[in-house]
Amino acid sequence: MGRELLGYCKCGYEKEVCIGGGFSGKSFEFPHYCESCNSLTSVDVLKKKPKCTECGSKDIKSYEAITKELPDDVSGLPYFMMKDYHKREDVQVENFCHQLDKTFVLMKGNHYCPRCKENSLMFHITWFFD
């Protein structure tokens, strides 16, 4: 299952992107920003050489969370809810990619905006697709 998100920033920049893929399983998209054309884009992470869908550049950066994720059986322990580990309420979207055997995580708020270069980009889920 996939989700469509609206990326929006206080500078006025808005762009729709996707996370996940449809029933066919032939693609799995995740939000990235392009440093060449300064835009938000959905990139198919299953492709060997992912590129910006706007300009074709390979100079793209993922919004994937780089955090210390914990197994479900220990994540509820008080010690592990402290800093350096993400909490479930900090997660905007989690989506499992079967082809890569990996969960892609997008955290809530304060992402890098490719237009104003501030960490003020937010994502809002607009709809689900399959």
What are these regions (language model features)?
Residues 14-17, 39-42, 59-61, 103-105, ...:
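Short functional micro-motifs and their immediate structural scaffolds
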Residues 1-19:
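Short, extreme N-terminal segment that most often corresponds to the first beta-strand
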Residues 26, 30-50, 57-67:
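Structured domain cores in non-transmembrane regions
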Residues 21-29, 46-47, 67-68, 80-81, ...:
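Short linker/helix segments within small regulatory modules
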Residues 8-11, 34-37, 52-55, 97-98, ...:
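Short cysteine-rich clusters marking metal-coordination/redox-active sites
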Residues 60-63, 74-76, 87-91:
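Terminal leader/tail segments of proteins
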Residues 112-130:
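Glycine-rich, aromatic-bearing surface loops/beta-hairpins
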Residues 3-8, 28-31, 49-52, 110:
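Residues immediately within or flanking Cys/His clusters that coordinate Zn2+
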